[in-house]
Structures are given as C-alpha cells and as structure tokens.
C-alpha cells in the first residue's frame, strides 16, 4: 500500500514540474500566441488532477486499512472486559456436594446469657433451625467469593456499570440464578465519596471510578429469601486508611455488643464512642470521624431486607431489645462531613412495599402499571431491585408506570443518600445470627 502511494506522489510531482516548465515556456513566447502550447498546458493540468485524485483515493484506502488493523485491538480490549463481566461461575453447591456450608465466626454469649452455650435445651432449638442457618451460610460463602473477586478485579478507570455487572453476574452464577429461590438480595451499591448509600448505576450512567474515590461496595445475596447483607469500603489511596479503620472498628464494636436481650440504644452508644475517637487527616486538614446519625443497621426478615427494628450508630434511647432467633445487619457509616445524609440524585433502588394496603394495589388503574407490578411480583417479590434489573427482563418504557406504583404506595423508592459535597464516607457491615446458644457472624471472612 505504501509503495503505490509513493509512485503516485512521484507522478504528481512530475506532472507539476512538467506543468511548470510548460507555463514558463508559454510566458517567454507571449500570452495566447500559440494555441498548441495552451493545449499542452491544459493536458498537463488534467493529468495532475487525475493523479491527485488517485493519490487521495489511495490515502483514504490506507487510512481505512489502518483503522481496520486497529479494530481487532479495540475489540480485544472490549472482549476482555465483557469476558470478565460475563465469566461463567459454577454454582456454589458444586463445591459443597454434601450441602453443608461453612460456619461464620461463632461467638459465645456473655454475662447473663453465658448459660446458653452449654444449655441442652438451647442446643436442641439451634439444631431444629439448622436448615435456616445453613441457607444463610450458603449465601455468606457466595458473598465472600464475590467480594474477593471484586477486590481483585476492580481498578480505577472502570465504569460503575462494569463494576456492578461484574459483582451481580458473579452472584447470579454462584447462586445458579434461581429467581426467588436464590440470587441478588438487593442491588449492588457503589456509592462514592460523599454519597453514603443507595447509589447503583442506571443504564445511561457514564460515571467512572477514579483513583482518589472512596467507594462503598454493598451487595446482598439471598437463598430462599434469607439475605446476607454485608459491605466494605474500597480505596486506592492510603490517605483514607484512618477513616476506614474507624468505621471497621465501630462495626466490630457493634457486633461485639449485640446479643439476645441487648438494648438497641446501648449498641448505638458503644458504636458512637468508638467512631468519634478517631481522626483522619486529608490534604493537611484534620477531621473527627462522625457517625452518620440518621443511618443505621437493622434486623432482616425473610424476603425483607428491613425487618422493622433499627440498630442505631449513636445513642438514641431506644430500649427495644434484640431477641433469640433474629438476624441483624450490623452496619456503621463514618463521615468527614456533617454526619447527616439526605436523599438526592437520580433514583435506582426500589422495592415492593410488603405493608402496602390492599386498596392501594386495587386502586391501580393503568394497565402498564399493572403489568409492571406483575413482573416485579414474579421476579423480585419484596426483595429490592434496581432499574437495570427491569431492563434485563426486557421491559421497555416503564418509568411512568414505575412512578405510578411509587405514588400509589405499592412500591417504595430509595434515592441516593448524600452528606455534604466534598466530604468522604465509609461503611462496613456484617450479618449476624442470634442463634439460641451462640452468636454467629455469618458473613465474616479473612478480609473483614
């Protein structure tokens, strides 16, 4: 290709030279004196234009070929990303053919409940619920494997959609993507910096992870509606280490304090004391780490991520007690900002309201809204979902219908929760089982 262009270029040069000589000769003989000379000049110009046109065509072909040569490289990079996202995962059951999944961290109760550890009646009650505990453990093992994958694969420059799909497809793969029997417990949250919770990318999202971002990775796994709710914070710059250390310590404090008959306010008070004992220095300015007082942990019901009880991360005088057999998500949020969040930004998280009155459902008149509700019931039930999950089911032009379901009270929306812009927030969370004889931090792993 290069040699052909060079030959044409030489021809163009030759024609130019010939044309120049011809013009010079004509000028020496006087203008328009010889029609013969004028014809020669016109012929040379025609040759020049043809040669130039040919050269331009060959240059265009050369450029097109270069682009074609580059395409495989671009496609190869895109393919690598797609393969990473669409990687096949063997169902977790293939690794545990006997159906028994590993326990989490088992902790004896203390003080007045110490007797539970050896009490035969309590041990018998625990055995009766072994199938339930085992389903939580299955979800926890999936969570541990997926978050290890996430920590290994997530890098600055990845889009939020790439990260979310990497995590969610891995959960679906390990779960066997079994609809309401197993899979995502709620959408993958990837809240950045001053955004503390409830951000997951929608289909049109162009946001990209940067080196200096602080990202809360919060995702759930469920097995027959038994939900593992666990979260960690991912950073690349070690200047945030003290912030992460504060929140991790606060979460572990909440886990230690939790137990049967423990008052919720006492847990919040212990968490607050630990969190506020930390400081973090960022770009020469020192901040006390503040608990985000209007965020909290919660108990978990079957197919219900929020079961009705809230575990505060500050003292709040709620004397409600934890009870035997309950499951709790112990989570804490620390901030360099004001320690208070508000709902702001484009919503991605939704869930059918399990307490919606019957007349709210019967009041839905628009057929499209009824159809969408049927899709939600069949695929998510009362588990939280996001707009990308609806897209994935092939639904189109559903936003008006979704908003109608929200306005009717049948579906609840959960917009992103943000602290003051410019601040940084971190989160750590574990799921604990208050078994009759021991407390099990079922989602505990070697990482946190």
Swiss-Prot record:
It holds the Pfam family Peptidase_M24. GO terms for biological process: protein maturation; proteolysis. The keyword Cytoplasm applies. It comes from the Eukaryota. Residues 1-47 are annotated as: Disordered. GO terms for cellular component: cytoplasm. A divalent metal cation 2 binds at residues 229, 298, 331, 429. Residues 24-34 have a biased composition (Basic residues). Its cofactor is Co(2+); Zn(2+); Mn(2+); Fe(2+). Its main location: cytoplasm. CDD domains: MetAP2. GO terms for molecular function: initiator methionyl aminopeptidase activity; metal ion binding; metalloaminopeptidase activity. InterPro entries: Creatinase/aminopeptidase-like (IPR036005), Met_Aminopeptidase_Type2 (IPR050247), Pept_M24 (IPR000994), Pept_M24_MAP (IPR001714), Pept_M24A_MAP2 (IPR002468), Pept_M24A_MAP2_BS (IPR018349), WH-like_DNA-bd_sf (IPR036388), WH_DNA-bd_sf (IPR036390). Keywords: Aminopeptidase, Cytoplasm, Hydrolase, Metal-binding, Protease. It is found in: Cytoplasm. It catalyses: Release of N-terminal amino acids, preferentially methionine, from peptides and arylamides. Substrate binds at residues 198, 306. The keyword Membrane does not apply. A divalent metal cation 1 binds at residues 218, 229, 429. Its EC number is 3.4.11.18. Cotranslationally removes the N-terminal methionine from nascent proteins. The N-terminal methionine is often cleaved when the second residue in the primary sequence is small and uncharged (Met-Ala-, Cys, Gly, Pro, Ser, Thr, or Val). This is Methionine aminopeptidase 2. It comes from Komagataella phaffii (strain GS115 / ATCC 20864) (Yeast). The gene is MAP2.
């Amino acid at each position: 290709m290069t040699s052909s262009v060079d030959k044409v270029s030489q021809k163009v040069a030759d024609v130019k030279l010939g044309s120049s000589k011809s013009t010079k000769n004509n000028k020496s003989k006087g203008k328009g004196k010889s029609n013969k000379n004028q014809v020669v000049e016109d012929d040379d110009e025609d040759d020049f234009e043809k040669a130039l046109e040919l050269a331009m065509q060959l240059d265009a072909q050369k450029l097109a070929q270069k682009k074609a040569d580059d395409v495989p490289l671009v496609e190869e990079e895109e393919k690598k990303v797609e393969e990473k996202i669409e990687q096949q995962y063997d169902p977790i059951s293939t690794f545990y053919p006997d159906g028994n999944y590993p326990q989490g961290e088992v902790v004896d109760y203390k003080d007045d409940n110490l007797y539970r550890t050896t009490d035969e009646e309590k041990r018998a009650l625990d055995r009766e619920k072994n199938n339930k505990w085992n389903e939580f453990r299955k979800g926890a093992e999936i969570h541990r494997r997926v978050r290890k994958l996430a920590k290994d694969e997530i890098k600055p420059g990845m889009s939020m959609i790439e990260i979310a799909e990497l995590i969610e497809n891995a959960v679906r793969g390990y779960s066997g993507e079994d609809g309401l029997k197993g899979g995502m417990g709620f959408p993958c949250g990837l809240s950045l910096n001053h955004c503390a919770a409830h951000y997951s990318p929608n289909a049109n999202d162009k946001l990209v992870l940067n080196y200096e971002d602080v990202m809360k990775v919060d995702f759930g796994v469920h097995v027959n509606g038994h939900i593992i709710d666990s979260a960690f914070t991912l950073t690349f710059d070690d200047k945030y280490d003290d912030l992460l250390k504060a929140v991790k310590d606060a979460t572990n404090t909440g886990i230690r304090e939790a137990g049967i008959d423990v008052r919720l306010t006492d847990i919040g008070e212990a968490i607050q004391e630990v969190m506020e004992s930390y400081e973090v220095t960022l770009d020469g300015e020192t901040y006390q780490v503040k608990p985000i007082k209007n965020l909290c942990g919660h108990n978990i019901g079957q197919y219900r991520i929020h079961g009705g009880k809230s575990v505060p991360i500050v003292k709040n005088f709620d004397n409600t007690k934890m009870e035997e057999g309950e499951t709790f998500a112990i989570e804490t949020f620390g901030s360099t900002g004001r320690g208070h969040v508000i709902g702001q930004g484009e919503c991605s998280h939704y869930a059918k309201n399990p307490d919606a009155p019957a007349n709210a459902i019967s009041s839905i008149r628009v057929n499209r809204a009824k159809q969408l509700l049927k899709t939600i019931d069949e695929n998510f039930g009362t588990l939280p979902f996001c707009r990308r999950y609806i897209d994935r089911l092939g639904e189109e032009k559903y936003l008006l219908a979704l908003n109608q379901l929200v306005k009717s009270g049948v579906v609840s929306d959960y917009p992103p929760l943000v602290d003051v812009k410019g601040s940084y927030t971190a989160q750590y969370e574990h799921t604990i089982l208050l078994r009759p004889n021991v407390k099990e931090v079922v989602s505990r792993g070697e990482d946190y």
